[in-house]
Amino acid sequence: MGMLDGLTNMFKMHDDDDFDDDYEDYDDDFDEDYEDDKPSARKRLFTGSSKKDSVADEEVSYTAEKPRFASKSKVVPMKTQSARGLEVVVIRPESMEDAKEITDTLLTGKAVVLNLEGIHVEIAQRIIDYSAGSTYAIRGNLQKITNYIFLVTPPNVDISGDIPEIVTGGIDLSSFNKNENRF
């Protein structure tokens, strides 16, 4: 067996070999001291941390976090109607039953020009009373243009100027320069 002993001695494959005596157990403590730079997928799932978080941020907290809500604002946004979308409706009621149409139009945010010409005075008075009540209830505005024509507006429409003065021609047009082209 000389040749087989020579080969095993050469490869040190026999039992009396102490080849691992000089080897120290470096990997025995490896798992205890090792900190993973990237959290595992399971840890990220339950802690909510992303892959880019640092190791210091990865500490797991078992206390429940308080939900984060934006502070309640005391300002409530209001839908405003642009001047382009403003609509004026001319209504000429014939009976008291038509007064409901005035209120419905105001509730949609549209202004109403109420023409009561040609109606019996008592019915016209009842329609004005009804319209004044509904205008007051929605905090709108009711203005007399002439004896039989009224302007009824919802709260989102402001009326400026003196309407009867404008209708009767009470504005002095001489203050406008006709030679100057402003537009």
Swiss-Prot record:
The cross-references to HAMAP family, in alphabetical order and at most eight, read: SepF
Oligomeric state and interaction partners are given as: Homodimer. Interacts with FtsZ.
Species this chain originates from:
Lachnospira eligens (strain ATCC 27750 / DSM 3376 / VPI C15-48 / C15-B4) (Eubacterium eligens)
Query: What's the source species' lineage?
Result: Bacteria, Bacillati, Bacillota, Clostridia, Lachnospirales
Instruction: Tell whether Cell division is among the UniProt keywords.
Output: yes
Q: Where is this region: Disordered?
A: 13-58
Q: Which domain of life is it from?
A: Bacteria
Q: What is this protein called?
A: Cell division protein SepF
Keyword vocabulary terms for this entry: Cell cycle, Cell division, Cytoplasm, Septation
